[in-house]
Structure formats: structure tokens, C-alpha cells
Amino acid sequence: MFQIPVENLDNIRKVRKKVKGILVDIGLDSCKELLKDLKGFDPGEKYFHNTSWGDVSLWEPSGKKVRYRTKPYCCGLCKYSTKVLTSFKNHLHRYHEDEIDQELVIPCPNCVFASQPKVVGRHFRMFHAPVRKVQNYTVNILGETKSSRSDVISFTCLKCNFSNTLYYSMKKHVLVAHFHYLINSYFGLRTEEMGEQPKTNDTVSIEKIPPPDKYYCKKCNANASSQDALMYHILTSDIHRDLENKLRSVISEHIKRTGLLKQTHIAPKPAAHLAAPANGSAPSAPAQPPCFHLALPQNSPSPAAGQPVTVAQGAPGSLTHSPPAAGQSHMTLVSSPLPVGQNSLTLQPPAPQPVFLSHGVPLHQSVNPPVLPLSQPVGPVNKSVGTSVLPINQTVRPGVLPLTQPVGPINRPVGPGVLPVSPSVTPGVLQAVSPGVLSVSRAVPSGVLPAGQMTPAGQMTPAGVIPGQTATSGVLPTGQMVQSGVLPVGQTAPSRVLPPGQTAPLRVISAGQVVPSGLLSPNQTVSSSAVVPVNQGVNSGVLQLSQPVVSGVLPVGQPVRPGVLQLNQTVGTNILPVNQPVRPGASQNTTFLTSGSILRQLIPTGKQVNGIPTYTLAPVSVTLPVPPGGLATVAPPQMPIQLLPSGAAAPMAGSMPGMPSPPVLVNAAQSVFVQASSSAADTNQVLKQAKQWKTCPVCNELFPSNVYQVHMEVAHKHSESKSGEKLEPEKLAACAPFLKWMREKTVRCLSCKCLVSEEELIHHLLMHGLGCLFCPCTFHDIKGLSEHSRNRHLGKKKLPMDYSNRGFQLDVDANGNLLFPHLDFITILPKEKLGEREVYLAILAGIHSKSLVPVYVKVRPQAEGTPGSTGKRVSTCPFCFGPFVTTEAYELHLKERHHIMPTVHTVLKSPAFKCIHCCGVYTGNMTLAAIAVHLVRCRSAPKDSSSDLQAQPGFIHNSELLLVSGEVMHDSSFSVKRKLPDGHLGAEDQRHGEEQPPILNADAAPGPEKVTSVVPFKRQRNESRTEGPIVKDEALQILALDPKKYEGRSYEEKKQFLKDYFHKKPYPSKKEIELLSSLFWVWKIDVASFFGKRRYICMKAIKNHKPSVLLGFDMSELKNVKHRLNFEYEP
């Protein structure tokens, strides 16, 4: 802001004096007039003596000025202020109960403003009054009405995203849905008269209670006639404002500027229809675009077979449907609107289907599918789909599986947009084909899947594709009948193994090869086996294997198209006919093959038989037919496959159904070609996979990347998998508030202030104790925690509110059981502490921790015969990393070598160490340097107590030698003493050294020869001072005094030597400070600070006492003095 400069200051100053005099005269006159008035009024001596100066004065000049109170709630009667409204109300009730009406403050419900009730009411009317929506309707040419612009205020729940435009409805939703545990503290029902009447007259007694007194508020005893009235009182009364503050914390307010309001149609316009008739006669149901339609057909044909169910998007959680029909077997979910050019979708309801009942499932149990995903693709879509719709996966409840499903009349082509339903099986019942089977790349030729063909339900393959839907070339031919568990259609993996036009190598199974029945693909099962020859012709580029299957498996003997892998199977005795459906309750256990090829399952074993390499297949369980009462599964042993010459076949005889499966002869053509995929993307993927090769570290064999993992699991982990199948691991959840997850494979203990490695994690957890999530109990053993969880908290599968409200999560399945998606740590405990079973621990941090995801730990029992179990290290020295078998040897080592002994901190209740001489407990970071400094200054310690920490007497010429654990180690990266920059004097290194915590690792130093590689770099720098070298005699010549006679002396004598040295040479060099610190086992910073402190004392004494010096001394010595001298001449 510009200001005009002031001129004529002299004249203005002269005028000021006159103005001041005039004002003084005016004030004096006014005071005289007031004095005359006061003399005329005399209240008396009583009031004069009872009046103090503070009653008439405006402010006290001698008192301190009251500071501005920055907190929002300030008391006007005193100096109190606070940030919380409840604290302010408590203050008023305690100290100003009489004047509470003057200072009562209430908050604004819509903002942070708080004041007296009248002021808040005026504030609310001014700033938060609801805008009256005045709708000015204008009539256009068509006669339709348009509403004016209006701003809609909506409220949203932050926990479940529920939204509403009414604030009261929003508060009611939050209270009922998310704070339901608070309802019991407010809702009360008067039952005095009910207790006096007998049980048969309960309804009469309730009627006798007057309506206003039936319900009451437990907080303020307000009466209400109904639950809604009581709810309105709780949510709107000013008495329960604290409850509103809780509810408002999870409510978000949004102002939507909608412009012109959308038109509301009383009758919807005609839209695309979705019909689900029973037999083609049911009328189609009208639908609006923003709705989903669920067609629920019946098993029995009836006019009302299709019952439409409409789910509106506008009302979340609401479901309106017509009366459901009984005996529903499946559900069809269709997305609306349909593609362009299609007006309806017709689905024929299935006939009563035979179901396969697993063991323990009732015979008449109906299929009850859960909610289905909408338009979920089966596999990767390589090309544009056009107007066709991908199939939907139907989920079937475990234990019930329909075996046949008619596709409907498909002799004629169906228009685009047909939505077939391909039911898949829930994991645990049957294993469906992995994604990638249905690849939208080529159209299905005509004539595939004629009318009336039966396809097994649950087989998620192109066998259930209706013409018009795109699929791969591997589709079942005309008239082919496939039973589930025999062959998934579309298995075209051989084209991804070999490049185009290249013959299969010798690793492909040759003719006459013997394959045990258990060595099939991981998801393929064979009931029993017999031997049949190959009599099927193979087209160009087709790999064909002849797999004989007996007893309970339907044959597949149809010709296949290019790119399809087919197993030609013949039927032996006790085999169901082709057209015979499986009866409910039959004892066949059918599964699916994987979508990968047989060639992918060939795993080289690295061994040869007669010069021919052998291969293995992934092991799989074999199902044997048993009586209808149950199912039996036998795990076959893993056996290699021998490549025999072509034509060499071993005769086989049919085996009994109950006997184990004998080997199966698998014959193949002598020259087998594999046709590659025509698409460039598949070719690039094959070439990319072929470039990735890995070497097995066990057998030194080279494998492709897609075979290496399977080889490791099969060839080198078979014994471990066998042992793991015996007992199911136990899954537990616990709390460890003393741990902090730092990074991968590393955690930090907040109590001990140290890092804990993977090997010591479980011992550290048990040392501090694992806390129960549901109660304050703490356990120091796994067995105690397991028994406590089974006995006290059996059935509790949800986290407590303290954890769930803060965002802690545990992975659980549908039944509430713990899931372990990965393992962060794998540790070992002895069997006597753990038991026979493995234990999976999901460990959560404390309630106030920032890490919300648990750490998953697997604890395995240590076998008695495992190497290293007899010589297990019980304890490890945290200073020199020496292993000790017994606790006595460990404590003796600490006592003799480090002059400490383990103890427990009396306040922190954490492991600590104490001095054996003075019994003082070490606090902070424990290092050898801290022990050495304490021993030097400890009055109870003997003078030669630090001899164990000193190096052996001798002469070290090389400055690159480092002393670690009493042995001389050569390391060029470390120096004898820490080299410090100018001016730092070791403070920075000391700070860094103290920040580095010790690492507890039992396997850190198995021997003395590995000590230098294990000790951290910062610790070596810290301990280099305590493990100092022996200094040369030549280096001592630079010192002003000889320190040899003070070695091994007490701390006071060494301090006296430093004083003498200061009087001799008050300004030592850096080299002298380094030598003095290494000789007296003290820090260089301590030596430098000692000399600096003495110099400061001398300079202060010179300044205060002013010493004088007579002439006649050596003037050349003045050059060595660095402080100024004042020469005073005295005549």
C-alpha cells in the first residue's frame, strides 16, 4: 500500500504539543466533574472496605498477559481449553456446575463449528438450512415436463458404500449395520409385569403394559411407544449427541450438481426381451436395460417352468421375485441388453438329470448353486468375438454333480449372441480344465455336435459349445459320446512343444512302451487297465496314443481333427454301454485331464536303461471301484517310463477290478509329427519358452523352463510329499506385538532392539510369548497355544472387533478356516516341543501396528535322525558368535570372556545382561565397546579385568590386520583404527554404530575361520576400538610422556596421566589422540573432549585471574602459545 510521505514535520510537532495540552485540560475538567459527583454520593464505609482494586480496574498492570488459547473449546470462566468437546463438558460439570448454562457448548451437526445453543441454531439456519426445491415445470412442444436445476445432497457410508439422501436414514443404517453392539446400551424393554405372570400368560402381560412405557431409553429413561419412536429419540435427541459423533465419523457427505433432473417414466419404453420358456411356450418377460434377469427353470415340464427373477440396480440389497418353483437344478444368468440384431434368447430347460453323489451326501439332495459371475470368459480371447457371447461358468455345490446335460436342438445354425451355459465344478469335487481350452480363434465347422448328443456336465470344454460360438479346432466330431474323466476336448498342447515341421524326438513315447497306470497326467485317473492294440488311423499332424481302460470308463474311438490329442480306448468287461447313463450313487470317481499335452508330462529322470533315456510322468492317485458305500483311493508309486523299440509289446491280461493296476501298454506311430499352431502369437510363445532352459542342481540335467519345476517336484521332493501326507498341519493365529516386520526374511524385536533371523524367529517368539487374539493370555509353547485355542475358542473364526475395526485381515476360506497364500518363514522345532504335526502360524502385530497383513510362519518338527540334531546349538554368543551346546557352557563363556551374565530386565521384562562385578544391568545397545568402557570405569572390577578383552602381547607390523574374537584376521577392507575426517573425532561413527542392532543368528559362525565374513561391517568398525592392536615403540616417541607405566592401572590414575600430559602438551595432534585412546582403551572423542575441557578451564581462569609474567623468559616459546597474551608495562 502506497503512503504519501509526510512533510513539514517541524510544524506538525509544534502542533502536537498544543493538542496534547488541550486534551489534558479537557481530561482534567472531566475528572473534576466526576469528583464532584462522587462526593455527592456516599455509599458508606461498608462497601468501601469490601471493594478491592480488582473490582474497579480493567486490567492488572503487574500481572502477566493471558496467552491466546489455540484449542477450539475455551472456557470463559477460567483459563481452561481443550481439543475435545467431551473433555470441555466434563470440565464444566466439575468446576462450573452453577454457571454451566452460560458456557454450555454444542457442536454443529454438519460442520466443526461449536458454540452456545442459540448461536448454533442461528448458524444452522444461516449456513445449513435445506434449500427448498421449487420445481418450475415448463411444458415443451411434446407436452413433457422438465424440472429445473437442483443440487442433491447425498450421504455415503464409508464402510459399505451405502448411500441415501436423508441424514436420519443414514444414521439409522450406520447404527444398525455397523454399530449394532451399541443398541443394547440404549434400547430397553420393561418386563417387570412379565416376570410376575406365568409363562403361558406372557402375551397377556405384555398387553397389560401401557404403550408409552413398553420401551425406554437406558441412558436417559425416556419412554417410547414403539421401537421406531425409540430409535428416533436416540438419533435426534441432544442428550445422545455423543452417539451422533460416533455415527458421523463413518458418514461422508456429497453434493451432486445434477443440472436438469432426469425424466421419470411412469411406464417404461419397450426394450429387449429375455424369455426362458419351459418347452418353447412360455411368454417372454419384459426387462429394462439396468436390470439383470435370472431364469429359474424347473425339472418337470410345466407351463410355468421359467420363473423370472428381476434384480434392480437402483436398490442395493433388494430382490423381488415371483414364487420359486420346487426342484430347481440350475440357474441361467443373462446380461441385458442383448447385442444388436437379437431380440430374445431361448434356453430349453433340462430334463431330470442323473447326479453323481459323493460319499456322505444324501441321495435326494438338490443342487443349490451360489451367485454366478456375469459374462466371465473361459479362457484368453485371442481375437475379437464379434457379436457372440462367451459362455458362463456355472458353479455346482461340492458333492453333487450332474453327469449329463442336453444341449438342445442344434441341427440348425443359431444366430449370434447365443449364450451357452458350461457348468464348472467347485474345487474339491472334480477338477476342471485350466483356462486356455476355449480360445476364440477359429469357427466350429458345421456338423459338430448333432441333435440329442449328451455331453458330461462339469466338462468345461468345447463339447458344450453351440454352433455359432467360436472355439479352437480341437472340437469333438459328429456323433462322438464323451464321458467325464476320459478326455477333455480341445487339448492341443503338442503344437506348443515342437516347432513347425519338426519330428518329435526320442523322448516321445515310442511304440510298445510300458507305462504304469499311476504315471498319467496329474489330474487323470484310471479305474483299471487292460491291453489293447492300436487300430486307429492318424491324420496329418496328429499325435495319437492308444490308452486301454477297463471297468467303469466309457470308450472314445472317434476320428479326430488336426491338432487334437486323442486316446483310443476299448471297452473290456464290466464296462457301461455308450448310451447308458450312470445311475445316482454309482461308485465311479471321474475326473478330468489337464489341458496340457502328454508330452508336457514327460519328465527326464537323468538315468538310462540299455543306453535309452528314461522318463517319468507326474504322479496321480488311482481310483479303484468299491461297493456303493464309499470311495477308495490308492496312491501309486512313481516308476520311470522306458522307451522300448517299436513293436516290442508285453502281453497283458485283464486284471480284477479290486486289484492294483498293472502297467499299461502305450503304442504310438514310429514317425510322429506335431502340427504347430497357425497363429504367430503361439509361435512366438513357443520360441520364447524354448529359449529358457534351467539346470537341475541335483542331477545336473538341462530342462526347459516349463518342465524344470515339475521335475523338481517329482524327482527330488517325492519323499517329502509322502511324509507330508500323513498328518494334516495345524493352523493357528496369534499376536506378537513386540515384533516389527522390516523386510523379507527379517523382523525386528522391539523389546530386545535387535534383528531376528529366520532360524531364531520361533525361539524368539516363544521367549517373549505368543498372545491369543481373543483373550489376554500369553503362551510360551506351541502346544499350550494349540490346546487353548481348541478348548476355549473353538468355533471362533472371525477376528475380534479391536483388530477388524483397525483393518487387520486374515485370509480365510468359505468355511472360515485359515488360508496360507504363502509362507514368509520356515523354522524347525524339536518334536517334544511341537509334536508330530506341522504348525502353520499366522502372526499379527499389535493393535497399534501399521502392518495390517500377518506374517505366515511354518514350523516343522525336527526329526531325530536328521543331521545336526544331536549337536544342536542351544545358545549363540551375540558378541563373538560362538556356538554352545549347553546353557552352562554359554553362561561360563559370558562370565569369563565378556564379564557379563544373562538376566531379565526388572522394568521392561526383556532379556538383558548385567555386569558380574557390580551387578549393573546394561541398557541400550549391547556391544563389546560398551562392555569395555564399563569395565574401565567400573569401581568393583579388578584392575586387570580388561585383560581378556585386550589383544595378546606382540608386535603387529601390518596395519591391515584386524583382531576378531582373539584371532588375527587379514582383511584389506578394514583398518586398524577407524580413519575419521577432520573435526568429526569419531562422533559420526559412534552414532552409526549405536544405531546398528545386533543380529541374532544361530548359524552365523560355524567356525572361527568364517568369523570375518559373518560379523557385520559396522560392528567390526565399532569393535575395532576394543580389539585394538599393539602399538610400536617407535610410535610412542611422538608422545610427550611415556604411558607404559600406566597400562593396567585404574581409571583415576589414567585420568591423572592425561592431566599431566595436558600440562606438558595442551594441544595434542590427531596422531597423539589416536595413540592415547588405543593405549588406555577409551574413545578418541573422550580423549579429545578431555583436552578441550581442560583448555576451556585454563582460558576461563586466565580471564578471571589475569596472571602476569615477568620479563626474562624465552620469547621463542611464545610462538607455541595459540591464545592471546596481554603485556602490561609497569614502571
Curated annotation (Swiss-Prot):
Query: In this record, what's one Pfam family?
Result: ADNP_N
Q: Residues of crosslink Glycyl lysine isopeptide (Lys-Gly) (interchain with G-Cter in SUMO2)?
A: K118, K146, K979, K1018, K1032
Sites bearing Phosphoserine, chain numbering: S1024
User: Where, subcellularly, is it found?
Assistant: Nucleus
BP-aspect Gene Ontology terms: nervous system development; regulation of gene expression
Give yes or no: UniProt keyword Transport. no
Extract the PROSITE patterns matched here.
Answer: ZINC_FINGER_C2H2_1 (PS00028), ZINC_FINGER_C2H2_2 (PS50157)
- Zinc finger extent (C2H2-type): 73-96, 106-128, 155-178, 215-240, 694-716, 747-768, 770-793, 875-898, 913-937
Decide whether keyword Coiled coil is in the record: no
Q: Gene Ontology cellular component?
A: chromatin; nucleus
Give the signal peptide range: none
| SUPFAM superfamilies (UniProt xref) | Homeodomain-like (SSF46689)
User: Which InterPro entries does this UniProt record tie to the protein?
Assistant: ADNP/ADNP2, ADNP_Znf, HD, Homeodomain-like_sf, Znf_C2H2_type
Q: Where is this cross-link: Glycyl lysine isopeptide (Lys-Gly) (interchain with G-Cter in SUMO1)?
A: K1032
Regions recorded as binding DNA: 1043-1102
Instruction: Identify the keywords attached in UniProt to this record, alphabetized.
Output: DNA-binding, Homeobox, Isopeptide bond, Metal-binding, Nucleus, Phosphoprotein, Repeat, Transcription, Transcription regulation, Ubl conjugation, Zinc, Zinc-finger
Q: Where is this region: Disordered?
A: 274-329
Positions with biased composition (Low complexity): 274-285
Provide the GO MF annotations for this entry: DNA binding; DNA-binding transcription factor activity, RNA polymerase II-specific; zinc ion binding
Q: What does this protein do?
A: May be involved in transcriptional regulation. May play a role in neuronal function; perhaps involved in protection of brain tissues from oxidative stress. May be involved in erythroid differentiation.
The family this protein is said to belong to: Belongs to the krueppel C2H2-type zinc-finger protein family.
Provide the assembly information: May interact with SMARCA4/BRG1.
Q: What is this protein called?
A: Activity-dependent neuroprotector homeobox protein 2
Q: Which organism is it from?
A: Homo sapiens
User: Which gene is annotated as encoding this protein in its UniProt record?
Assistant: ADNP2
